[in-house]
């Protein structure tokens, strides 16, 4: 699915901008590989917490895993740069009219939805609304959800556009 999204986003950019397309595509491929690696690492940390909990106590296991994750975070954060470029280049190209979509599609762009979905729990907390599990899930799945919103919007646009061209 991720590779399909990388190719689809890249295909949206006008052919005249080969350098931007190439950078965006390479960042996309790197993002797919790194995302799989990071998600596997996070799952491994969850497994360690589950495994260690009964053996050394839940609090000690959580402290050990959290300390390790905190120590690794500075090494992991730069790996998100290609993902920012993958979506950022597409966002800018859409904003300046260099894709096949009208600017109105910005309302469905992964950057917009990712920011919205990731911000909802923070906004709720600022409004002193009790944070619920669904808010955490929304925040943690924001990129995947944002990609799905874009794919649906792009499919609807393409269907309407094709019907309009057909007559």
Q: Could you tell me what each predicted segment is?
A:
Residues 1-166:
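Hydrophobic, aromatic-enriched alpha-helical segments typical of multi-pass transmembrane helices
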């Amino acid at each position: 699915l991720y590779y399909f999204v990388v190719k689809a986003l890249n295909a949206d950019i006008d052919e005249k901008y080969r350098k931007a397309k190439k950078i965006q595509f390479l960042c996309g491929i790197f993002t797919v590989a790194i995302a799989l690696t990071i998600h596997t690492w996070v799952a491994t940390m969850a497994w360690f917490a589950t495994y260690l909990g009964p053996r050394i106590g839940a609090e000690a296991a959580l402290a050990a895993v959290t300390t390790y994750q905190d120590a690794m975070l500075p090494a992991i954060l730069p790996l998100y740069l290609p993902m920012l470029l993958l979506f950022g280049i597409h966002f800018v190209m859409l904003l300046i009219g260099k894709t096949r979509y009208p600017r109105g599609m910005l309302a469905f762009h992964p950057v917009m939805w990712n920011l919205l979905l990731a911000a909802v729990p923070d906004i709720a907390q600022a409004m002193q609304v009790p944070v619920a599990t669904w808010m955490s899930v929304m925040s943690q799945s924001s990129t995947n959800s944002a990609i799905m919103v874009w794919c649906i919007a792009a499919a609807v646009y393409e269907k309407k556009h094709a019907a309009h061209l057909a007559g």
